[in-house]
């Protein structure tokens, strides 16, 4: 414990230039950077949302297309809506079909609706 107290005392007596030199030497010795963690965290926190891949998607029915009956059937199967509700949804496009879906689920729904003749987009 006495050795640590001596090190603390020696570090406390360093001038600003000596402390900067010590910092550079330790960076080289240990292969690290003495960048301020707060600044790095703030920059990383600001950049993180842009870099992160979106995990939740909204499946939007843009247009029912020429084969509305097939699209209505598919909407009913995907959402569990009744015939009238599904018909109103398709005819009232653009409307969300599913909100907060995972990427895989959203892609699956999109491909099923497009196969039925609808125009769909993910947001």
Swiss-Prot record:
The keyword Ribosomal protein applies. GO terms for cellular component: cytoplasm; ribonucleoprotein complex; ribosome. InterPro entries: Ribosomal_bL12, Ribosomal_bL12_C, Ribosomal_bL12_C/ClpS-like, Ribosomal_bL12_oligo, Ribosomal_bL12_oligo_N_sf. One of its GO terms (molecular function) is structural constituent of ribosome. Keywords: Ribonucleoprotein, Ribosomal protein. Signal peptide: none annotated. Forms part of the ribosomal stalk which helps the ribosome interact with GTP-bound translation factors. Is thus essential for accurate translation. Homodimer. Part of the ribosomal stalk of the 50S ribosomal subunit. Forms a multimeric L10(L12)X complex, where L10 forms an elongated spine to which 2 to 4 L12 dimers bind in a sequential fashion. Binds GTP-bound translation factors. Belongs to the bacterial ribosomal protein bL12 family. This is Large ribosomal subunit protein bL12.
């Amino acid at each position: 414990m006495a050795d640590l107290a001596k090190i603390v005392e020696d570090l406390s007596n360093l001038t600003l230039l000596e402390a900067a030199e010590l910092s550079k030497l330790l960076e080289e010795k240990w292969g690290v950077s003495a960048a301020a963690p707060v600044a790095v965290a703030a920059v990383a926190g600001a950049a993180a949302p842009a870099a992160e891949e979106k995990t939740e998607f909204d499946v939007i029915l843009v247009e029912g297309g020429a084969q509305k009956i097939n699209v209505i059937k598919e909407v009913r199967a995907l959402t569990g809506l009744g015939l009238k509700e599904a018909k109103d949804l398709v005819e009232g496009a653009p409307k969300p079909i599913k909100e907060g879906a995972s990427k895989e689920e959203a892609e699956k729904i999109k491909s099923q609706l497009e196969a039925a003749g609808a125009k769909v987009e993910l947001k």
